[in-house]
């Protein structure tokens, strides 16, 4: 593709050099650059891409996109100066890969909790209908049934457009994608055309990056502000920010709720550990999910599928066949008659939702033992809140290590313990070794009790000092169960 074709989607401040050259690849990582490539320099959170411009030129880059021009310009290289490289990178990548999102029905899901579940269940629903479908999520990316490992909730613009291009080339009609607040703030989705967007909820998370809840809200809201006129926005009325998200959107707004009058209205009729009986828009359905938060997630899936042209009755049949997403309220029965639940809940609100769901089924007939930690090098403010919420809704609490990253596990545990009063501490243990913490919970549990192992869900590693060590909560539980049969 000619460089001048790529530049039609952006507004350069200045161009130095030949625009008629052929570009054979686009990169934001100088290590990936080959002869004939366009290297795009961005100010990253860890490193500044501008520092790698000489290395990119050395490796054969024939064009450089940047915010600040180098002092010395290399001969035979075209330099494109832009005001906002993050925005330009997304748009340039979209153009280079042939605007793949315009060939797909791309639906984005954003919010603090529920993104993975909703995106994955939409993917499964539309595969049930017989379509080739793409999924971009925290757990894994899929091109129909081909699994592609994932690094981030939302990939960088080049990886993302390359992936969407493959999805379009391989015949996918629909793509369901988690849209993180980081990806919106960093404009990783710049240039993409969305057919629809779904808002789940907004609670405290990622304040290590956004600094304030207001900034976090603005990042989420921008996704809907930028939605095109012919798209839909489906928002959760049960969240106080639901209508705030869509107040400036050009898209058609629809609502879903378990509490209020809305376009897609739901309620929980019955709840058991085997599943729930629900009512969606005056239709009853039985599902293999537990908890009001999952009823809300399924209602969002129901609404989005209908807005994408499916009949309500057909969607209800599809929903009744679905299974919970890996690491999301993942229940395992022990030989001793207690239940262990592995869940990704890593925010105070998500933890409350899961614990409320457990109590809704138990109805006071068993104890709740919660094993929980908090991630290192992340929002420290939520640590004492996580511990407090666990203690409020549990009979016993074991504070343990999660992904400590570059912090000391005991320091994180101490931050969590600071949220507990004297009464809370009487029912709380602190065990830094996560495996030992889970084993202790199993020793404390009796028939009819529930153990919640929260925070990691689908993850099969512990991030310690920059190294990912294999660790899987569900594997650990199964191993303990097999030893105690």
From Swiss-Prot:
Entry binding sites for meso-2,6-diaminopimelate: 378, 402-405, 455, 459
GO cellular component: cytoplasm
Compartments it resides in: Cytoplasm
InterPro entries cross-referenced by the UniProt entry: Mur-like_cat_sf, Mur_ligase_C, Mur_ligase_C_dom_sf, Mur_ligase_cen, Mur_ligase_N, MurE/MurF_N, UDP-N-AcMur-Glu-dNH2Pim_ligase
Associated pathway: Cell wall biogenesis; peptidoglycan biosynthesis
Highest taxon listed in the record's lineage: Bacteria
Molecular-function GO terms, alphabetical: ATP binding; magnesium ion binding; UDP-N-acetylmuramoylalanyl-D-glutamate-2,6-diaminopimelate ligase activity
Catalysed reaction, written as an equation: UDP-N-acetyl-alpha-D-muramoyl-L-alanyl-D-glutamate + meso-2,6-diaminopimelate + ATP = UDP-N-acetyl-alpha-D-muramoyl-L-alanyl-gamma-D-glutamyl-meso-2,6-diaminopimelate + ADP + phosphate + H(+)
Record SUPFAM superfamilies: MurD-like peptide ligases, catalytic domain, MurD-like peptide ligases, peptide-binding domain, MurE/MurF N-terminal domain
Residue numbers of N6-carboxylysine PTMs: 220
NCBIfam families according to UniProt: murE, PRK00139.1-2, PRK00139.1-4
PANTHER family, per database record: MUR LIGASE FAMILY MEMBER, UDP-N-ACETYLMURAMOYL-L-ALANYL-D-GLUTAMATE--2,6-DIAMINOPIMELATE LIGASE MURE HOMOLOG, CHLOROPLASTIC
The family this protein is said to belong to: Belongs to the MurCDEF family. MurE subfamily.
Protein name: UDP-N-acetylmuramoyl-L-alanyl-D-glutamate--2,6-diaminopimelate ligase
Organism annotation: Bacteroides fragilis (strain YCH46)
The organism's taxonomic lineage, starting at the top: Bacteria, Pseudomonadati, Bacteroidota, Bacteroidia, Bacteroidales
Gene name of the record: murE
């Amino acid at each position: 593709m000619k460089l001048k074709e790529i530049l039609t989607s952006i507004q350069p401040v200045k161009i130095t050099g030949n625009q008629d050259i052929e570009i054979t690849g686009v990169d934001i990582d100088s290590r990936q650059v080959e002869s004939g490539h366009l290297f795009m320099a961005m100010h990253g959170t860890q490193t500044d891409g501008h520092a790698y411009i000489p290395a990119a030129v050395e490796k054969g880059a024939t064009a450089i996109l940047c915010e600040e021009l180098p002092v010395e310009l290399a001969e035979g290289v075209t330099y494109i100066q832009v005001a906002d490289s993050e925005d330009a990178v997304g748009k340039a990548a979209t153009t280079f890969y042939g605007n793949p999102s315009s060939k797909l029905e791309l639906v984005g899901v954003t919010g603090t909790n529920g993104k993975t579940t909703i995106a994955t269940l939409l993917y499964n629903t539309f595969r049930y209908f017989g379509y080739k479908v793409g999924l971009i999520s925290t757990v894994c990316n899929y091109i129909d049934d081909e699994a592609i490992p994932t690094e981030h909730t939302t990939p960088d613009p080049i990886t993302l457009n390359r992936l969407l291009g493959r999805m379009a080339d391989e015949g996918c009609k629909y793509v369901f994608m988690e849209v993180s607040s980081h990806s919106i703030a960093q404009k990783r989705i710049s240039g993409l055309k969305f057919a629809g967007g779904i808002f789940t909820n907004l609670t405290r998370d990622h304040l290590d990056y956004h600094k304030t809840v207001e900034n976090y809200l603005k990042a989420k809201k921008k996704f809907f502000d930028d939605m095109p006129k012919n798209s839909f926005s489906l928002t959760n009325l049960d969240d106080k920010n639901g209508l705030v998200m869509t107040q400036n959107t050009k898209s058609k707004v629809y609502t879903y709720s378990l509490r209020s009058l809305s376009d897609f209205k739901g309620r929980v009729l019955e709840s058991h550990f085997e599943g729930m009986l629900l009512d969606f828009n005056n239709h009853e359905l039985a599902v293999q999910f537990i908890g009001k938060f999952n009823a809300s997630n399924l209602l969002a899936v129901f609404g989005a599928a209908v807005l994408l042209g499916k009949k309500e009755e057909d969607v209800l049949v599809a929903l009744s066949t679905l299974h919970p997403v890996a690491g999301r309220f993942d229940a395992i029965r022990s030989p001793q008659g207690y239940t262990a639940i592995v869940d990704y809940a890593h925010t105070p609100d998500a933890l409350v939702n899961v614990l409320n769901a457990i109590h809704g089924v138990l109805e006071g007939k068993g104890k709740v033992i919660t094993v929980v930690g908090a991630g290192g090098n992340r929002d420290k403010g939520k640590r004492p809140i996580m511990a407090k919420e666990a203690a409020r809704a549990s009979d016993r609490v074991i504070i343990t290590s999660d992904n400590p990253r570059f912090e000391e596990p005991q320091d994180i545990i101490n931050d969590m313990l600071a949220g507990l009063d004297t009464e809370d501490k009487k029912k709380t243990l602190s065990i830094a070794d996560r495996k030992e913490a889970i084993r202790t919970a199993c020793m404390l549990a009796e028939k009819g009790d529930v153990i919640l192992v929260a925070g990691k869900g689908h993850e099969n590693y512990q991030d310690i000092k920059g190294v990912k060590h294999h660790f899987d909560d569900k594997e650990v539980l199964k191993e303990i169960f097999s030893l105690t049969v």
